């Protein structure tokens, strides 16, 4: 079945998909640097609108369905949504990190739901990053970065290049021969020191094992961490173990949404506690 027919078929039963209550969609074929499917997306309430470019024969359409139809990053139905929304409103410049941004669909979803946030998306694969940049063009608050993410500033190479478009993995090393800069979360926070940490979304295909191996003080600064773990993809590799150790002593709720785990701080909304958390995080003390 042609990709445009597949997408159109999705919209024939809008009640099946929560995203159809949030957005209107208009799929069409388009040509720009090669043939792809374009989907015009408009919010049913508010002024958000964008055109998504998806590659036929890839996992782009499945990613689109997860984010915009099944709304796996939606918090509005969670018991703590009002608390999350209040915290967001209290931030002058909320910061969202989209680590493993793929082609930018998650960044755009965050831009719709949290319109005053600065969204920094990091994606290692060149093809994904090119489409990411095209998809977010015109959205001034979305900052695309090509690179990997790691526990410290280093370099990386992409491995398993034959994987699907959402399955690229990175291997961290200290040699520039890798050709790809790997940034730490602290570097991103330093670059945007005028912003207040809000959401950190992580989908980095098993690289969470290295990311959480050290220098995890930043975790306490984010009221919301959204992560997809990959033990199912790499059995007996312990890819989630370091994440679990990093958050084990923290007071947080954990909520499953699709393939993602939402980790929501119990201290959110308490200014004195947030200030204390920041101080303890800087000192390397778990909260």
Q: What residue ranges belong to the model's regions?
A:
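Phosphate/nucleotide-binding beta-alpha loop and adjacent structural elements of enzyme active sites
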Residues: 1-287
């Amino acid at each position: 079945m042609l990709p445009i027919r597949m997408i159109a078929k999705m919209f024939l039963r809008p009640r099946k998909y929560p995203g159809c209550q949030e957005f209107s969609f208009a799929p069409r074929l388009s040509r720009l640097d090669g043939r792809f499917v374009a989907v015009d997306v408009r919010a049913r309430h508010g002024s958000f609108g964008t055109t998504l470019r998806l590659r036929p024969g890839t996992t782009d359409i499945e990613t689109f369905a997860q984010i915009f139809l099944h709304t796996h990053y939606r918090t509005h139905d969670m018991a703590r949504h009002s608390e999350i929304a209040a915290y967001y409103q209290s931030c002058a410049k909320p910061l969202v990190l989209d680590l493993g941004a793929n082609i930018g669909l998650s960044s755009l979803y965050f831009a719709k739901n949290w319109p005053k946030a600065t969204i920094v998306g990091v994606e290692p694969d060149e093809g994904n990053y090119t489409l990411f940049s095209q998809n977010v063009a015109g959205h001034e608050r979305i900052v695309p970065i090509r690179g990997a993410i790691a526990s410290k500033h280093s370099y990386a190479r992409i491995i398993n290049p034959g994987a699907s478009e959402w399955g690229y993995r990175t291997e961290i090393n200290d040699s520039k021969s890798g050709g790809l800069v790997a940034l730490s979360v602290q570097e991103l926070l330093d670059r945007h020191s005028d912003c207040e940490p809000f959401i950190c979304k992580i989908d980095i295909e098993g690289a969470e094992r290295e990311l959480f191996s050290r220098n995890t003080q930043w975790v306490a600064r984010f009221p919301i961490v959204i992560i997809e773990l990959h033990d199912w993809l790499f059995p007996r590799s312990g890819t989630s173990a370091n994440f679990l150790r990093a958050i084990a002593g923290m007071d947080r709720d954990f909520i499953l949404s699709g393939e993602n785990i939402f980790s929501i701080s119990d201290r959110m909304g308490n200014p004195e506690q947030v200030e204390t958390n920041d101080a303890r995080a800087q000192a390397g003390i778990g909260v």
